[in-house]
Design a protein with these regions (language model features):
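Outer-membrane beta-barrel initiation region
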Residues: 20-125
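Outer membrane beta-barrel transmembrane domains
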Residues: 220-222, 260-269, 294-296, 303-382, ...
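Residue-level signature of outer-membrane beta-barrel architecture
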Residues: 86-88, 119-121, 148-152, 191-199, ...
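Repeated loop/turn-to-beta-strand initiation elements of outer-membrane beta-barrel proteins
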Residues: 92-98, 122-131, 153-160, 196-203, ...
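Transmembrane beta-strands of outer-membrane beta-barrel pores
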Residues: 48-50, 70-74, 100-106, 133-139, ...
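Outer-membrane beta-barrel proteins
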Residues: 107-110, 140-143, 157, 168-174, ...
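Outer-membrane beta-barrel "beta-signal"
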Residues: 365-367, 391-403
């Protein structure tokens, strides 16, 4: 266990940075636009099971925790999400606090790797304050986060509210003589509260103003003259879990991204926005001693547009579903599943030859295997076959551990 903790604490030393450049026709923002199975992969085939999600929400601040979700989405693309939480007591008042998050390429325009490490101190019997930083190699990209948390029931109920100051020292440390007209200040929250009749309310998110930056000196910044970015996200979830293995969950998640860039070379300026709304329900139940049924449904609405470079409008709605049957043994189980997706995609641009509509029905047959190492660790392996597209549907590995 101690070796595991050392290994995962070492992982917290990872981080990334980003730099601006003139865009080209192979625009990352349009990654996934034509992928009719984009949401079928991410939200059905490779989604965390309701039981796993419930345990993660319950224990993410009570214990140290790690979960990894990786699955193939194309012959040359691998979707990988990582969440690592460290809540290590140091004495009666202090805890080491660390969080590493990687959001793989899904519907989001940019992949995110975020690291925050610091300390949490109890100030009353049921509350604490914290301060964390992102020890980025390039100092202009160091983030600072601080906040307050109210805890209850051994930290399994909580209300956490904080503020994240992104690129805290960017004005002084940036290498391009840039000026910041608006700092990126973000409100972050996470809460889990018990309601009546075994229902639980969970929510997390971060909402802020984003940054606005100008680069007045062409000698220091020969390509870009202005850069604004805002990225917000939130989710609300209601879950009910009973002792006989039945569970219900319904949730809404929202994601909004906006980036504006102005370049000194003509013809590259753009104002890009991407908004995704996802409404979902999930149900699981044990039938007898050996059988488990899991039902999942999503409705996704995505709206994106670019003004200027690569001007376009992107309108997408997906209806998704999955039926998962698991045959159970004491420490493991084998899953047979059918997943389906009906996308409705419309892409319009000033040049009508660039326009397209996609609405092909997509479905998968999935074979999976789960093994429970202990009440604190599980792994799932799966492979799938694309029925309507007549091809291999990808393999996936999911792992979740508390320590």
């Amino acid at each position: 266990m101690e070796n595991t903790r050392r290994l995962l604490l070492t992982l917290l030393l990872c981080g990334t940075s980003a730099s601006a450049q003139v865009p080209d026709d192979d625009w990352d923002f349009e990654e996934g636009y034509r992928a009719q199975m984009l949401y079928l992969h991410a939200l059905v085939n490779y989604a965390y099971d309701l039981e796993w999600q419930y345990e993660w929400e319950r224990r993410q601040f009570a214990d140290n925790s790690l979960r990894i979700n990786t699955g193939s989405v194309a012959s040359d693309k691998l979707l990988t999400d990582i969440d690592l939480n460290i809540n290590q007591p140091l004495n009666e008042k202090w805890r080491f606090m660390g969080r590493f998050t990687r959001n793989g390429f899904r519907w989001r325009p940019v992949r995110e790797d975020r690291l925050l490490v610091g300390l949490e101190r109890s100030i009353l019997d049921s509350s604490a304050v914290y301060l964390t930083v992102n020890p980025e190699f390039d100092k202009e990209f160091i983030d600072v986060a601080a906040g307050y948390t109210f805890y209850k029931d051994n930290r399994e109920q909580y209300v956490r509210i904080g503020v994240l100051a992104e690129d805290f020292d960017w004005d002084i440390k940036n290498r391009f003589a840039g000026q910041q007209d608006q700092r990126a200040i973000t409100v972050q929250w996470a809460l889990r509260l018990s309601l009546a009749n075994n229902w639980w309310l969970y929510s997390d998110g971060e909402v802020g103003s984003g940054f606005e930056r100008t680069f007045p000196d062409p000698a220091e910044s020969p390509d870009i003259s202005r850069h604004d970015r805002r990225e917000n996200m939130a989710q609300v979830r209601l879950t009910r879990r009973e002792s006989d293995g039945k569970a219900w969950s319904a949730w809404i998640s929202w994601y909004d991204f906006n980036e504006l860039k102005e370049f000194r070379p003509p013809g590259f300026d753009y104002d890009y926005r991407n908004t995704v709304l996802n409404v979902a329900v999930e149900h699981t139940r044990i039938i007898g001693e050996r059988h488990r049924l899991r039902l999942l449904a999503h409705y996704v609405d995505q709206q994106a547009e670019s003004i200027g470079f690569n001007a376009h409008n992107y309108d997408r709605q997906d209806i998704l579903g999955g039926v998962f049957y698991e045959y159970l043994w004491p420490m493991s189980g084998v899953t047979f599943a059918y997943a389906l997706g009906q996308p409705d995609i419309t892409y319009t641009a000033p040049d009508s030859t660039d326009n397209y509509d996609l609405d092909d029905y997509r479905d998968k047959l999935i074979l999976g295997w789960r093994y429970t190492f202990s009440e604190d660790a599980q792994i799932r392996l799966s492979i799938s076959h694309e029925v309507s597209a007549h091809g291999f549907g990808g393999g996936a590995v999911q792992f979740q551990m508390f320590f």
